[in-house]
A protein has these predicted regions:
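A cross-family kinase active-site recognition segment
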Residues: 120-170, 190-192, 226
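Conserved NTP-binding catalytic cores of kinases and kinase-like/nucleotidyltransferase enzymes
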Residues: 1-85, 208-213, 330-332
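ATP-binding pocket architecture of kinase catalytic cores
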Residues: 41-145
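A glycine-centered beta->alpha junction motif in the catalytic cores
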Residues: 91, 106-121, 160-165, 290-307
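An alpha-helical support segment within catalytic cores of ATP-dependent transferases
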Residues: 5-19, 146, 158-197, 201, ...
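ATP/Mg2+ or Mg2+-diphosphate-binding catalytic cores
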Residues: 292-332
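Active-site activation/catalytic loop segments of kinase-like enzymes and analogous catalytic loops
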Residues: 230-271, 287-304
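Active-site acidic catalytic loop and adjacent metal/ATP-binding pocket
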Residues: 33-50, 54, 85-86, 183-231
Length: 332
């Protein structure tokens, strides 16, 4: 979450007032790479407490965010999420319209701030919990039919791939193309449905106060779309089961198969995998790493094209995902 669009205190005050939230202060959130986000402090909050999160969606259309609101309200009784606040003037006829505001034709939502912190490391118990959570999400969203009416359009990663591979070193372009060719040959009957598609550790919150970490929040539902469930599984495994080194240690990438097995065990406690899904998982892990390699390159491209600079802009290193893709590919 970064900040690309800037609002005045008067604008924050007016928007928050639509939900009965008494605005006092907004503080930019700099994690993430797609939308403009702020913590909101109200008159009821004390010291450095913040009780709400204010998000202005930079890329997704108002129609897409309206779908997302429906999805989040469908999940609110099954998983720890923060459903968007409903306006004081809500009629109850359309949950999307009751929650979504607009600024220069961009959608805005206000949600309660969930308790917990982002994990800096994970363990097998946390991976097991995440497997259960993702399977619960998949099963719960099967109630929204037809699923295509609720998912947002998938991004055209093939176009990004063509642009980026044209400038890559030969070995990197070959790696990308080989993995994509293997993905194209996967069985076409892999189960599909509404998927989160961005369930990284920094999109989760945890309570670490007890002996066992407790999942307290799932965040960022802007990418929910109809895809192979296995893709959602692979995306989540790739982050939760990988230790990302810092710049100090050369930004190493270490994948932990014990964590992956714990994740799969948790997932299958809710939704068993098919034989084809099990067979396809290694290729899907490599393919999903290339997608996030391309995503990070794409963010750099658009930041450069649109002149986005400053301390409030976050860019994640694409080379980490390239290394993860290569690591998975060597095992296939």
């Amino acid at each position: 979450m970064s900040v690309y669009t800037h609002l005045s205190d008067d604008e924050f005050f007016a928007f928050c007032g639509l939900f009965g939230v008494t605005f006092k202060k907004a503080v930019p959130i700099t994690q993430g790479i797609k939308n403009s986000n702020w913590f909101i402090q109200t008159d009821s909050d004390v010291d450095d407490e913040f009780s709400h999160v204010f998000t202005l969606f930079e890329e997704r259309s108002v129609a897409d965010i309206t779908k997302m609101v429906t999805i989040m309200h469908a999940l609110k009784d099954k998983l720890p999420i923060a459903p968007p606040l409903v306006k004081l003037t809500a009629t109850g006829d359309d949950i999307g319209s009751d929650c979504v505001m607009r600024y220069e034709n961009k959608a805005i939502l206000v949600v309660p701030k969930l308790l917990g912190t982002h994990p800096t490391t994970t363990n097998t118990a946390m991976c097991h919990t995440m497997g259960q959570a993702l399977a619960t999400l998949h099963k719960t969203l099967q109630t929204l039919q037809p699923a295509e009416n609720y998912g947002v359009p998938l991004y055209d990663w093939a176009r990004v791939k063509e642009r980026e591979t044209a400038y890559m070193p030969t070995d990197e372009a070959r790696l990308m193309n080989d993995i994509w060719a293997a993905y194209a040959n996967l069985p076409h009957d892999l189960p599909r449905g509404l998927c989160h598609l961005d369930m990284f550790a920094d999109n989760t919150l945890w309570d670490f106060s007890g002996d066992t970490a407790r999942l307290t929040g799932l965040l960022d539902f802007t990418e929910v779309s109809v895809e192979h469930y296995l893709m959602d599984i692979a995306i989540t495994i790739n982050d939760f089961c990988t230790t990302w080194g810092s710049a100090r240690d050369g930004e190493s990438v270490n994948f932990n198969t014990d964590k992956m097995m714990a994740f799969i065990d948790g997932y299958e406690a809710i939704r068993p995998l098919t034989d084809n899904e099990r067979t396809a998982l290694p290729v899907m892990l490599a393919y999903c790493a290339t997608i996030f390699w391309l995503l990070r390159l794409n963010v750099i491209y658009y930041n450069r094209e649109q002149g986005r600079t400053g301390d409030d802009i976050m860019v994640k290193n694409p080379d980490l995902m390239k290394r993860l893709a290569s690591l998975h590919w060597t095992k296939i």
